[in-house]
Each structure stands twice: as structure tokens, then as C-alpha cells.
Amino acid sequence: MLEKIKKSFRSASSKNGSYSVGMIALVICMVIVVNLIAGQLPENVKSIDISDNNIYGVSKTSKKALNKLDKKVTFKIYAEKDSTDTRIKSFIKKYTALSDKISVKWIDPVLHPAALTKAGVDKNTIVISCKDTGKTKSVSFDDILVSDSYSYYTTGSSSASEFDGEGQFTSAINSVTSEQTEKIYYTTGHGEATFSDSVTKLFSKNNLTTDEVNLMMTGKIPDDCDLLFMDASSKDISDDEKTLLLNYLKKGGKVFIILGDSEDETPNLNEVLKEYGMQEADGYIADMQRSYQGNYYYIFPEITATDDLANNLESKMVLMINAHGLITTDPARDTITTTAFMQTSDNSYAVTEDKQEEGTYTLGAVATEQITSDDSSDSSSSKDSSSDATKTSRLTVISSESMIDSQITDTYTTLENLDLFMNAVTANFDKTKNVAIKAKSLEVSNNTMQHAGIISILTIFGIPLVILIYGFMRWWKRRKA
């Protein structure tokens, strides 16, 4: 009997069976080891985002901000964890894993109802706080999964159309850890345009507050003004306002002007531009070389921005419609430096009813001037000025309001109009960088082979094909045995 058993183990089939059992055991051991190793990896490494539009992805802007985070931040989540939307839970886990300065605590409002009252928030809210600064900011789940209000009014039901987890979290962390808040005053009384919701949200995400000012009524620029903004005025400023603006700039102030359409001449505004090395060309600009589908007044400017103005620009695709042109000239003082950051090609024309002037035109420019303490000792434009400080006055000009027009920025979401605009705004502040992240669309896109990623192709075709080939080779080898 014993000899029969020994003999059976010497047979070819027995050897093959033993080999198979050994291989299975080895594979099982390898799988266990790999899973143990994978379990120790950080959340941001072991999770792969296969969602449409990469909603779980974290941009370079946020990663830089989190890498520089030097204060401890706490996420207190007042919600039932099991019933929380999976997208929110997954993103919280991935985002907070990027910094060891962030701690997360879930508080169940059903088990601890008094916690909501104590915190002064509703359920499904994340309270982000920093103990060092004593600041807190609340982010509702509704701010993360943004519903389509238009769909609600047209169909009676609404669903999430955007995912804004990254934008809300990075903004909140920036807000609670920052020691200073910058304030923007926008002028009224000249038929100015109003900021779109998209621009207002980006201001808020960058911890910038806004308020209006009528310079004709006040006769001065507010003491707490960090940036004076004039958005596409349709009327000229008065002589007094011109003097006010020029004096403000000469004392180290910051002014941002977006040119508008005016039926009348604007000599006073033109004098402000001229003093800082800019002159408005007549008519509208048509670009024969860099236009949108042959419409020469729909221009893709050449972006020549550098440093902070070029922060996180990838495609450098900006669209401007019916733009006025600027011509750089010699400024009034040698201490003023004027630099263009948006230009047309050299095959462009300033078009009026009477003529067409060919040339290269500037569509966005910045003029700066170093101001000594003697020149600005009575200035109220900077909150942190000192008697021995040297300030930098800054005049930023963009030649068309279409740069931030919601009809363009909301329609062509891949353009970088708002990214460049916010860079131009935050460049006016020493301690503020553009960390505003736009919400990501949740619209479903058809995944055709033309756009399939390499991971999808390998998963769907590559791995099964390798298994089939290996199985066929094993079968063929055994068949020959």
C-alpha cells in the first residue's frame, strides 16, 4: 500500500498537480504580502482617480499650499459618516492625507445633537479651524456638491452639477491660517460692470473682501483699501477723480482698470494711462493670426506673463472678444516700468469705421513704480506701511471686460481667463497668492476609444489578453505532455 502511494507521487500527473498547488500557494502568499504593503501606503498614493474630470485629483496649487502649511488645522465633520456621499468621504480622506498638519474628526449629530448647537452649525457641515490663529470657516456639503439651480427651476428637480471639494478646502485652509485679509474697493458712478458670480467666488476663495466706493461722493479712497478696482466704466472719470487716482498711485497705491465701451471720449482716464506708459488705440482689435475659428475679433492673446502672473498657467489659452488695444509709450517718469503680459500677433489691426492701423497691440499691461518713504509718508494705501519702507505702486490694465465675462468663462471652461485674471489681482498683494480652485463639472462624458486613457486600455484589454495567452500556453504544454 505504501509503495503504491509513493509510486503515485512519482507519476507525471502527480508532479504537475504538486507544481500547481505550490504555485497557487506562492501566488496567495504574494497577494497577502502585496496587500500588507499596499495597506501601509499613504491614501493619496494607493487610490487612483478614475472619475470623469478627475474630481478626486488635487492640483499643484493645493499641493504647494499644503506643503507650505506650518500651522495645525482641524477638520471637524458634523455628519453621519455612513450616510455621507461617497464622493465627499473619498475626497476628504485623500485631501487630508497630503499634510500631516491636518487632523480629521467625525462627529455624529444623531449621537451628539448638542454638538451642532455648540458649534453653531447645521448637520452635514465641515468646520475647518486653526488653533494658532483662532479662526474657523464652515464648509457645507452643499458647497462641495453644487446643485444646478437652473435645472431645478426648469424641471422641478436638481442634482449635483459640480464638485468643489478642493476649491472649498484649500480656500478654507488659506483663510484660517492667514494673518491678514486684503480688501478690494470697486468704483461706482461711471456705469461700471458688476462682477460675475464666478469672479465673486474666486475673490472669496482667495480670502479677499470687496466693497464699493463712489469717489465723487467720498472725495477720497478709503484708508483700508488694498486695491482700487474700476471695472469697465462707460463714462469718463472727473478731473477730481483723475487727481485722486494719480495721487493715490504716487503714494504707493494699487489700481486695477478694465477698459469698457464708452460712446464719449475719456480724456481724464486716458491721462492716467498715459502717465504710466499706456495709450488706448482707436477702435477694436482684429487679429488675423490668433483668432477663434476665423472670427478676427475673437482673439487668443499671446501670454507673455512671468513670475506671479504666470502662476499655474498651463495651456495659456485666454479668449478676449471685441477688445480695445493699448500702445505702450514712454511713461511720465523714469522710475515707472511698464510691462505687457498679453499681446496680439504682429498681424493685427485697430479697426474703426474710417481706417485700419496694423501693428502689435497690448491687451494687458502692468506699470510699477518704486515709491520712497518721503514720497508716501502721508499715504493711507497700505495697512503695514512704515516710515522707512519703500512701497511699490502698481497699475494693472486689461483692455476688455470680456476677459471675465461669465458668458465666456462659463461657456469655455477650459480657458484660463479667470486664472490669469486672479493672478493679476493677487499680484498686487505681498502675502497673497492665487489659491482659488475652480469647481469641477460632474457632467458625464462618453469614454470613447479616442479619448481612453492608457490605464483604461490596459485594464479592459491588456490584462485579460495576457491571462488568455498564458492560459493557452499552459493548456498547450499540458496537451503535449
Residue spans of the language-model regions?
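Short, surface-exposed patches at the edges or C-terminal ends of soluble domains, predominantly
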Residues: 2-481
